[in-house]
Amino acid sequence: MVWKPLAHTAACLAGAFLLGGLIGFERQFRHRLAGLRTNTLVAVGAATFVVFSSLVSGDSSPTRVAAQIVSGIGFLGAGIIFKEGFNVRGLNTAATLWCSAAVGVLCGAGLISHAAVATVFIIAVNALLRPLVQVLEFQAMRRGAFQPTYAIDIICHGDAEAQVRALLLRDIGDHLHIHELESSNIEGTNRVEVSATVRADQRQDRLLEQIVGHLSLEPRITSARWRIEDDSGGLSGL
């Protein structure tokens, strides 16, 4: 009597191990944060919780356990997602972990064939759609959608830092995409340098000149200039 449920558990966990490993192998091959071991552990862990709910009598519905697994994976995925400037990285890796948990839930419920089908689709999304994304990005660049990067440097009195940042954000508005905004004290003075890196859908030299020209009229700003980041000979405004 003991061997039958034990064999069922072993089969479920083995399925989660193999399928989670397949998903993780693709991630490991591309050197992602969550690779072979992480995706395999997520799948096996999710399967274990579902198997446990089916073995214990009482108020332990597998569907309820699956809902709790989804919540738990959310916390794990949040640790992988991070911001780099104004860019968010790790979203695809976190989504893959979420899918690995779903595969584990299916395996834990004994639906290994269904889990195998889901695994095929998950790997296909990560592997086959990547070239399509690259083609779309290349086509966008050919259409002139390359985004030039501009740097704006402003020096102001220390007590005007917050005002300058607010004015800069207001003038940028929806015309440019902010990539980075930071402030630093200039040693030995009461001045602060506010630096911003922005991107545009196309060359916006005239707009940058207008923004910097408007800011230079502020009495608490002592210097304002802009330049094109990827062009050492780019224009600058005082």
Curated annotation (Swiss-Prot):
The chain crosses the membrane at residues 5-25, 38-58, 66-86, 105-125. GO terms for cellular component: plasma membrane. Its main location: membrane. Keywords: Cell inner membrane, Cell membrane, Membrane, Transmembrane, Transmembrane helix, Virulence. It is a multi-pass membrane protein. It is found in: Cell inner membrane. It holds the Pfam family MgtC. Virulence factor required for growth in low Mg(2+) medium and for intramacrophage survival. May be involved in regulating membrane potential by activating Na(+)/K(+)-ATPase. Belongs to the MgtC/SapB family. This is Protein MgtC.
